[in-house]
UniProtKB/Swiss-Prot annotation:
MF (Gene Ontology): magnesium ion binding; orotate phosphoribosyltransferase activity
Function: Catalyzes the transfer of a ribosyl phosphate group from 5-phosphoribose 1-diphosphate to orotate, leading to the formation of orotidine monophosphate (OMP).
GO cellular component: cytoplasm
Protein name: Orotate phosphoribosyltransferase
Cofactor dependence: Mg(2+)
Keyword list, A-Z: Glycosyltransferase, Magnesium, Pyrimidine biosynthesis, Transferase
Gene: pyrE
Organism this protein belongs to: Thiobacillus denitrificans (strain ATCC 25259 / T1)
The protein's assembly and partners: Homodimer.
UniProt keyword annotation of Transferase present: yes
């Protein structure tokens, strides 16, 4: 895998953001791993996280004009990514939304740069796709165009039907979804460590049942 992808998996494990064991998902499945982006919770981790996202965005070649971080998790993500991109020589405006509209001051639900041109949505993962749907609606209501979505991890896992949430977003909105890492990269990480054979087998079994 690309060097930054391998580094990101190791970074997530070291930060205890990515854990292996037995975890119950919202869908009631027993997953052999858990990804909790909320534990990227200090300055150094957030700085590195933004850099990994920025590398994935540049690597993808996706064209966009504005970065949008949906409340709440997307807000620090968007800020850290545009700072990282600025360090790479690209200055990108960013915006985020409030959960509730403000009726004083600048008002409205969108804070930061105007949503115009091609807008790239950032999130940690795509589960049900609710956050993406709300973001797409908000962007289109501003007469802007959704350019795509960038996430930290693609679990490559079926939802209620035969497709993953990521596949559904790609097809429903006809936009690319860029992931810093996918389940494939997690598997490669486990394969390199002889002490993680049990975890590797658990992931393989889970993937056989729920993978896409």
């Amino acid at each position: 895998m690309s060097d930054y992808r391998a580094e990101f998996v190791e970074f997530a494990v070291a930060s205890q953001v990515l854990c292996f064991g037995e975890f119950k998902t919202k869908a009631g499945r027993l997953s052999p791993y858990f990804f909790n982006a909320g534990l990227f919770n200090d300055g150094e981790k957030l700085k590195r996280l933004g850099e990994f996202y920025a590398k994935a965005i540049v690597d993808s070649g996706i064209a966009f004009d504005v970065m949008f971080g949906p409340a709440y998790k997307g807000i620090p993500l968007a800020a850290s990514i545009v700072i990282a991109l600025a360090g790479m020589g690209r200055n990108v405006p960013f915006a985020f939304n409030r959960k509730e509209a403000k009726d004083h001051g600048e008002g409205g639900t969108v804070v930061g740069a105007p949503l115009q041109g091609r807008v790239l949505i950032v999130d940690d993962v795509i589960s049900a796709g609710t956050s993406v749907r709300e973001s797409v609606d908000l962007i289109r209501a501003s007469d802007a165009t959704p350019a795509g979505v960038v996430i930290a991890l693609d679990r490559m896992e079926r939802g209620q039907g035969d497709k993953s949430a990521v596949q559904e977003v790609r097809e429903q909105y006809d936009i690319p979804v860029v992931a810093v890492v996918t389940l494939d990269n997690l598997v490669e990480f486990l394969e390199r460590d002889a002490n993680r054979r049990t975890e590797l087998q658990a992931v393989a079994n889970y993937r056989e049942n729920y993978g896409v």
